[in-house]
């Protein structure tokens, strides 16, 4: 039957990509439908119970800066928070949280059920409705047809998913959930380029059977307790719990080696490529044969369960081998396994077949987000979901798509890497992937993206008000520090030495003093009984005041580096955003070699910058393309196209 209501946007899948996509489209005012095979598993954390980490936390902050749900849901469900790399520079500091699975799922579902313009429907999708080269809706497993102007596919690991435990396997999207076999077959019928990837998960352990007394306790950060959302507060966090650390040993490694003849990975049963940066324990033992032990983190799954996630022993070995290897680990000699570990193989679709908006190049109105694009991780999925949801909304409203730049957001780095380079293994975000990471910090994600989000219609009034207060306070206080001067008479040696290590010998601005590595803003403001502090607090809200202080300090201390990076960006921007005509035949570009023209015709890059990052496309080829565009009067910049861009960097 044809469902009586037509929607603007349909989102298929209710994981981390799907929920952010649906919420974003609905915030833009689009009539949105989220189709999921099970409403009870919306926002499910299918693997480890954690959010964030190096590179990943940056993505979560960016999603939050644009009104997304992941950071706020983590603040409401996080049972341990830590700042990683806290002793290093601000570019690589990252927030990580352990989350209570049940509370996280509840927080996401509450947002979905209370979001205007968004409806939920429980049915697996078996087919896409396509007319010509345009998607017009989706068909469920019982034949209900939903029509829409745009469809966002966020199928995760469900497309023709196959679960492996030892040499036994069965179809499934994850343990306990069916695979999307019919939808996978339909996508293959559409001739979209695809491949096979693999991921895995460890056995879960009953905490009552673990001896924590022989393990190392790993508490979270308590002074202060971090928050994920720019609008978050520590009071939102539930009870905080520690994690625990133990290690594998030589006996563990011998047990694993003895079971490799029944491993689906090492007997050729699994064809998909697994994630390089989250390898299985059998992969670790094989690849790092001389390493005597591997660290294992015992992570609590929640406040109302005894279940623990042993991070570090993901495996698809037979259950008897899993049991033996777990019992060989210190503190887990008597451990009871609640759920066996497994590997899952699934279909993904080559992201080089997508535009920078995440819309398919082959089928108009069809967007892809999450693991279906070859990525791994909740955070990468959520970021893509946000972008796909926004651009589905732009497509419906006939507005230019928003395509974040590499110098603007980790989301821009992520998508650009996917659509220009493709994937041969599950893609994970790291800070090292970003050329401009000093400008792409966690702390300034709102300064980079909230204004863009407001223009696009995904940032609400409360967030916009807090952002403006923060931006104005940072600007005002930075100017005050630059224009307030002190000299040796005003700052005698007995006051200067404890802070600076020596007396001042000439006049300095407060900004000059703060620029010194050893000087902190709070210490400078407390100098001489607070004589140099602002007349009024930075903000009445303590968490916002702390964010303002952090922005001021980083902006002043790293001003020279940030300015140099901004100059590099300006130099690259002219050619980076030059648009390439859709119908350009690269074989007609004079001087372009056959291999290069073939690759460009195959990948159809949207901009000169994207073209430059395709393997085999040389700087000389880019120069020839530029000459061709100028001769023909073709090509236009992002600014000329009218797409929202936002600020690449505020005063940090």
Curated annotation (Swiss-Prot):
Q: Transmembrane ranges?
A: none
Question: What domain of life does the UniProt record list for this protein's source?
Answer: Bacteria
A GO cellular component annotation in the UniProt record: cytosol
Q: Does the keyword NAD apply?
A: yes
Assign the protein's first listed, main location to one coarse class: cytoplasm
According to its UniProt entry, the protein's GO biological process terms are: tRNA methylation; tRNA wobble uridine modification
Q: Where does FAD bind?
A: 13-18
What would be an example GO MF term here?
A: flavin adenine dinucleotide binding
Positions annotated to bind NAD(+): 274-288
Question: Which keywords fit this entry according to its UniProt record?
Answer: Cytoplasm, FAD, Flavoprotein, NAD, tRNA processing
Pfam families referenced in this protein's UniProt entry, alphabetically: GIDA (PF01134), GIDA_C_1st (PF21680), SAM_GIDA_C (PF13932)
What is the protein's known function? Answer: NAD-binding protein involved in the addition of a carboxymethylaminomethyl (cmnm) group at the wobble position (U34) of certain tRNAs, forming tRNA-cmnm(5)s(2)U34.
Provide the family line.
Belongs to the MnmG family.
Q: Which PANTHER family match?
A: GLUCOSE INHIBITED DIVISION PROTEIN A, PROTEIN MTO1 HOMOLOG, MITOCHONDRIAL
What this protein is called in its record is tRNA uridine 5-carboxymethylaminomethyl modification enzyme MnmG
């Amino acid at each position: 039957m044809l469902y009586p209501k037509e929607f603007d946007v349909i989102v298929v899948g209710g994981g981390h990509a799907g929920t952010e996509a649906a919420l974003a489209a609905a915030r833009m005012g689009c009539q949105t439908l989220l189709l999921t095979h099970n409403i009870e598993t919306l926002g499910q954390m299918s693997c480890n119970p954690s959010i964030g980490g190096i590179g990943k936390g940056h993505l979560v902050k960016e999603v939050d800066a644009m009104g997304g749900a992941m950071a706020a849901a983590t603040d409401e469900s996080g049972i341990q928070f830590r700042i990683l790399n806290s002793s290093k520079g601000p570019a690589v500091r990252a927030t990580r949280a352990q989350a209570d699975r049940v509370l996280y799922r509840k927080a996401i579902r509450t947002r979905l059920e209370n979001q205007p313009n968004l409806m939920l429907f429980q049915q697996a999708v078996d087919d896409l409705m396509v007319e010509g080269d345009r998607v017009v809706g989706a068909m469920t497993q019982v034949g209900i047809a939903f029509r829409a102007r745009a469809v966002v596919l966020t199928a995760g690991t469900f497309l023709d998913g196959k679960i492996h435990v030892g040499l036994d396997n069965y179809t499934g999207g994850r343990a306990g959930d069916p695979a999307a076999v019919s939808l996978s077959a339909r996508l293959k019928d559409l001739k979209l380029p695809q491949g096979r990837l693999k991921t895995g998960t460890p056995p879960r352990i009953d905490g009552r059977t673990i001896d924590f007394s022989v393990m190392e306790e790993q508490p979270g950060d308590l002074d202060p307790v971090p928050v994920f959302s720019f609008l978050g507060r520590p009071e939102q966090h539930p009870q905080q719990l520690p994690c625990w650390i133990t290690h594998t040993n030589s006996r563990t490694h011998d047990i694993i080696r003895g079971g490799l003849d029944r491993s689906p990975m090492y007997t050729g049963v699994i064809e998909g490529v697994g994630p390089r940066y989250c390898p299985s324990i059998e992969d670790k033992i094989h690849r790092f044969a001389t390493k005597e032990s591997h660290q294992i983190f015992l992570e609590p799954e929640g406040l109302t369960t005894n279940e623990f996630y042993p991070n570090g022993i993901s495996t698809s070995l037979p259950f008897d081998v899993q049991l033996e290897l777990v019992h060989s680990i210190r503190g887990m000699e008597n451990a009871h396994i609640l759920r066996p570990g497994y590997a899952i193989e699934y279909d993904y679709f080559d992201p080089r077949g997508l535009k920078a908006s995440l819309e398919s190049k082959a089928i108009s109105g069809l967007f892809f987000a999450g693991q279906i694009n070859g990525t791994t991780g909740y955070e990468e999925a959520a970021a893509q979901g946000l972008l796909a949801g926004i651009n589905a909304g732009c497509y419906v409203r006939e507005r230019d798509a928003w395509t974040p730049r590499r110098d603007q957001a980790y989301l821009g780095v992520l998508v650009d890497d996917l659509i220009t380079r493709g994937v041969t293994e599950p893609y994970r975000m790291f800070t090292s992937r970003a050329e401009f990471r000093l400008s792409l910090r966690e702390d300034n994600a709102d300064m980079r993206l909230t204004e863009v989000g407001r223009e696009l219609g995904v940032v609400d009034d409360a967030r916009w008000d807090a952002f403006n207060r923060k931006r104005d306070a940072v600007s005002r206080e930075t100017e005050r520090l630059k224009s307030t001067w002190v000299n040796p008479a005003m700052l005698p040696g007995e006051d200067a030495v404890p802070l600076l290590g020596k007396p001042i010998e000439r006049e300095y601005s407060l900004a000059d003093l703060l620029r010194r590595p050893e000087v902190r803003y709070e210490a400078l403001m407390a100098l001489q009984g607070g004589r140099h502090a602002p007349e009024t607090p930075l903000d009445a809200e303590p968490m916002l005041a702390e964010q303002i202080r952090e922005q001021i300090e980083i902006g002043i201390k790293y001003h020279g580096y940030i300015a140099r990076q901004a100059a590099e960006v300006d130099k690259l921007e002219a050619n980076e955003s030059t648009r390439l005509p859709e119908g350009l035949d690269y074989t007609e570009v004079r001087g372009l070699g056959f291999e290069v023209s073939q690759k460009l015709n195959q990948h159809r890059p949207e901009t000169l910058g994207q073209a430059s990052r395709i393997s085999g496309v040389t700087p000389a080829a880019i120069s020839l393309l530029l000459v061709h565009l100028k001769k023909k009067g073709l090509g236009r910049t992002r600014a000329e196209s009218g797409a929202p861009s936002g600020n690449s960097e505020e005063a940090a």
